[in-house]
């Protein structure tokens, strides 16, 4: 049961990390992060923080936001790749790797939140200079949802970090590993609990193997020879 619970946490972590990458990719493709209204009789144009330093809005702060978003995309890809390697056991799932994934998730979420807040500040700052008003679109809300997903992923990694480890440093429970090995070898152990005050029997363990079955005719022949000699 513990092993199943750990695998569910890992799958949930992978789910949030994968959707973060999907929403970041959608944010790159869709350029309608904000609608900028140039004037009463002028058309409305769209703007995205991935496109900076346009003739309409020549600001160095937008280039900083773009660079932060590139770092966020790179860290999110590394985080998802590391979680995938852990989920498929391509790398050992130790406490060090879980700390690394948790730190990557929190760092990526903080950087993305800082980039979004800075973008809002730049929009308010350029409202009276380059355009008359602005309106944010739904893609910014998905970006804030990415921040929530990254923080949830970090907390899930910390939750896995609190799981006990065995001697090899892996977070797979020892009991689950033993049961898997026993199932592979076809060995089953049944534990029978005796009531209190019952005396322990001498020996109730009987071994039945293929070797004993093969040796049983030879033993019968030896016993027959002994009986014949006695007669």
Curated annotation (Swiss-Prot):
Stretches of the chain found on the membrane's Cytoplasmic side: 1-13, 89-97, 157-231
Keywords annotated in UniProt: Cytoplasmic vesicle, Membrane, Transmembrane, Transmembrane helix
Membrane topology, Extracellular segments: 35-67, 119-135
Record membrane topology: Multi-pass membrane protein
Pfam family, one: TM225
Primary localization: membrane
Subcellular localization, as worded in the UniProt entry: Cytoplasmic vesicle, Secretory vesicle, Acrosome membrane
Superkingdom of origin organism: Eukaryota
Subunit organization: Interacts (via RVxF motif) with PPP1CC.
Protein name, per record: Transmembrane protein 225
Annotated organism of origin: Bos taurus
């Amino acid at each position: 049961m513990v092993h199943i619970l750990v695998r569910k946490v890992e799958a949930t972590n992978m789910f949030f990390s994968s959707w973060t990458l999907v929403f970041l990719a959608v944010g790159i493709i869709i350029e309608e992060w904000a609608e900028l209204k140039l004037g009463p009789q002028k058309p409305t144009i769209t703007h995205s923080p991935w496109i900076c330093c346009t003739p309409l809005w020549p600001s160095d702060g937008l280039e900083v936001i773009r660079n932060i978003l590139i770092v966020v995309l790179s860290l999110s890809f590394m985080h998802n790749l590391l979680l995938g390697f852990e989920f498929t056991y391509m790398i050992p799932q130790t406490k060090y790797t879980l700390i690394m994934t948790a730190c990557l998730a929190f760092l990526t979420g903080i950087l993305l939140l800082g980039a979004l807040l800075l973008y809002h500040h730049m929009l308010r700052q350029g409202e009276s200079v380059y355009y008359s008003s602005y309106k944010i679109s739904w893609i910014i809300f998905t970006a804030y949802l990415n921040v929530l997903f990254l923080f949830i992923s970090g907390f899930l990694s910390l939750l896995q970090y609190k799981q006990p480890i065995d001697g090899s440093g892996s977070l797979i429970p020892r009991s689950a590993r033993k049961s898997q090995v026993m199932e592979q070898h076809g060995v089953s152990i049944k534990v029978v609990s005796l009531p209190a005050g019952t005396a322990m029997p001498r020996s109730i363990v009987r071994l039945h193997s293929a070797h004993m079955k093969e040796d049983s005719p030879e033993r019968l022949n030896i016993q027959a020879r002994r009986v014949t000699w006695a007669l």
